[in-house]
Amino acid sequence: MRKTRPAGHRDGLTRRALLRTTLGAAALGVMPDATQAQEPSPDTTKRWGRLPNALGARSPAENPRRTLNPPTSSRTPLQDLQGTLTPSDLHYERHHSGLAVVDPRAYRLLVHGMVDRPLTFTLDDIKRFPAVTRTCFLECSGNFFGTREETTPQDVCGLTSQTEWTGVMLSTIFSEVGAHAGATWFLAEGQDAAVMTRSIPIKEVLGEAMLAYAQNGEALRPEQGYPVRLLLPGVEGNASVKWLRRMKLSDRPFMTREETSKYTDPLADGTARQFSLVMDARSVITSPAYPETIEKGFVEIRGIAWSGRGLVRRVEISTDGGRTWKAATLQQPVLPKAHARFRYAWQWDGRPTEIVSRAVDETGYVQPEMSALRSARGRRTRYHLNPVTGWTIAADGRVRFAVERVRV
């Protein structure tokens, strides 16, 4: 039954009255600014909300930050993220000589060597080619730290991030210059002060390699190689050379500084593993993790897994320190050479224990224990360490990094 209202009564403000109120408030300088509007209000229906901004911002209640490791890197806050995409401003950084600031109008990319037509491309030239977009992770080959119990997932392996990348296929560029059939390697050279250079085997990467000029729908950020970087899905991050300025095709590797004094794995028998480009399967539990404290009862174990070999097929969870394993649930979609999110429902009985995860990829590769890695490679390498990691849980619910598991 509809109640009657007095003649002339209207609910709220008319459009004209609302406009007068808004303009009057603006003239008096009493409109709430963006900072004020973002302050939590007991009743958001009783005050004006924030007006549109030229640039969006996070809620003040959310404060994810990269951890800084000056002067060369910063780490992604894995424990603070949802889904599988990393916001551009939280993507990890790794530099050899700081950021290169490149004028896009002056940008040039030289492609030469074993080609029919050596060419120099501008940024506009590159953007004229058919564009492709794909989602994949990047990971530094030195992405492991685990010497203290008071260590977060961000510190353990925060040198990995995942982005939607847009650019042109490397195969398109090589076709444009007429790459010779005998060309089996190419040199990628950056425009930073270190003149970062890597030799890349063409056959192994050509099907997926890109020249990327955008990430997550916007131009590359300077720390990610603006205006153009090489992108090699599944390959150690340093080979995806940023601020790309030159590619030279050859029939042999170039043996640069970065693949002799660095990024080569010395082995226990005195030999070395060179051009170990692919990042093997890995996982990390992001919650519960240090510095959390949990309570007895239901706990959801969450984390991410990835493999440079392709798809993550499964993630296994142990809640008894690795004695028994059970399958976690993978959040769909699971993409090749991409972070996959997993979860596992657990009833904690309140007794001290250790929770552990391990990934298995589509090739059957199983993420190894640190003892197996040390047995195969010795102790002189810090690259490509992807050991099984976990978290100890004390009787009072305090969570700490299981440092003894990786102290081999």
Identify the meaning behind each predicted range.
Residues 1-17, 28:
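N-terminal secretory signal peptides
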Residues 24-25, 35:
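Cleavable N-terminal signal peptides
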Residues 27-28, 179:
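A generic secondary-structure boundary signal that marks alpha-helix termini
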Residues 38-408:
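Structured, non-membrane catalytic/scaffold regions adjacent to prosthetic-group chemistry
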